[in-house]
């Protein structure tokens, strides 16, 4: 956190003395923070968060820059792909496919090509950890799902929203897409997309509106290791500490992205109000 504090102060163009005065602490305290000899207390971090908000300091971008710098310091062998992972309580022991079963692509170890989504997923958890990881995909079986209606239906299957048509050819088609695969690669239902996708599942928007949302949002990709073999191919490259203050800014970013998703869904719904089919109509036709 010491580099971030210094970066904030320099962004504001303040000396350590002036910065300390703004935060209601001593020069020596700020000096210890920036030298890494002490960490700000929770109260001090809250004060710093509130001050940065008032001064419109781009802390979220600074967090991304910190991760980018750490990423650029990593050198990988051929065949390895660099990815990001967020954990609510940190990785202990071997990496295993042990997420909740009803995630986008079922139970697995989830990684992203972009840091933003795993960061906002863990921002509400005090003991959360952020990791830069890599995976060797050369010996793994995998399937890659394009960002289209098939992707949304596959997510619906894994989230348990298709049980009413279990046993149909339509259900079996999607239940078998990633069966026996070590790795599933597909778009991320991020903070913006989550609201749009939920609106599709609950019948508020059609498949046409959903597909156009997918195109507009330009979603990043996630890699999901669903087997022990795939998890054994993953290596932790770096752990990036995330402070309480940073988590507050990540919460703000998550809320803002969710609101953008709501706005987007509402706008697209107006344009495609009756074009296409609703989710329940798709399921009814499959019975």
Annotate each language-model stretch with its function.
Residues 1-11:
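A short, Lys/Arg-rich alpha-helix, primarily the initiator
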Residues 58-104, 123, 276-287:
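ADP-ribose/NAD+-binding catalytic cleft of ART/PARP-like enzymes
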Residues 13-31:
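Short alpha-helical DNA-recognition segment
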Residues 135-287:
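Active-site and NAD+-binding cores of ADP-ribose-processing enzymes
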Residues 10, 24, 41-61:
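DNA major-groove recognition helix of helix-turn-helix/homeodomain DNA-binding modules
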Residues 66-68, 73, 80, 97-107, ...:
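ADP-ribosyltransferase catalytic core
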């Amino acid at each position: 956190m010491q580099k971030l504090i210094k970066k904030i102060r320099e962004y504001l163009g303040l000396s350590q003395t002036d910065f300390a005065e703004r935060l209601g602490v001593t020069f020596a305290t700020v000096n210890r923070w920036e030298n890494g000899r002490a960490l700000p207390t929770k109260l001090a971090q809250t004060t710093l968060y509130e001050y940065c908000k008032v001064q419109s300091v781009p802390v979220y971008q600074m967090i991304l820059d910190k991760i980018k710098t750490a990423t650029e310091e990593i050198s990988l062998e051929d065949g390895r792909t660099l990815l990001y992972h967020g954990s609510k309580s940190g990785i202990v022991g071997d990496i295993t496919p042990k997420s909740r079963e009803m995630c986008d692509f079922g139970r697995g170890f989830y990684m992203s090509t972009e840091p933003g989504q795993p960061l906002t997923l863990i921002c509400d958890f005090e003991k959360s950890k952020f990791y830069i990881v890599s995976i060797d995909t050369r010996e793994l079986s995998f399937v890659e799902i394009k960002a289209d209606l098939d992707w949304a239906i596959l997510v619906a299957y894994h989230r348990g929203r298709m049980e009413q048509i279990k046993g149909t050819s339509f259900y079996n088609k999607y239940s078998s897409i990633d069966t026996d695969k070590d790795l599933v690669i597909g778009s991320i239902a991020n903070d913006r997309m989550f609201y749009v996708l939920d609106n599709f599942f609950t019948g508020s928007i059609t498949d046409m509106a959903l597909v156009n949302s997918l195109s507009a949002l330009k979603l990043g990709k996630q890699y999901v290791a669903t087997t022990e073999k795939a998890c054994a191919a993953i290596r932790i490259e770096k752990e990036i500490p995330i402070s309480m203050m940073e988590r507050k800014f990540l919460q703000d970013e998550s809320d803002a992205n969710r609101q953008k998703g709501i706005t987007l869904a509402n706008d697209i719904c107006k344009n495609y109000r009756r074009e296409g089919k609703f989710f329940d109509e798709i399921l009814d036709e499959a019975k």
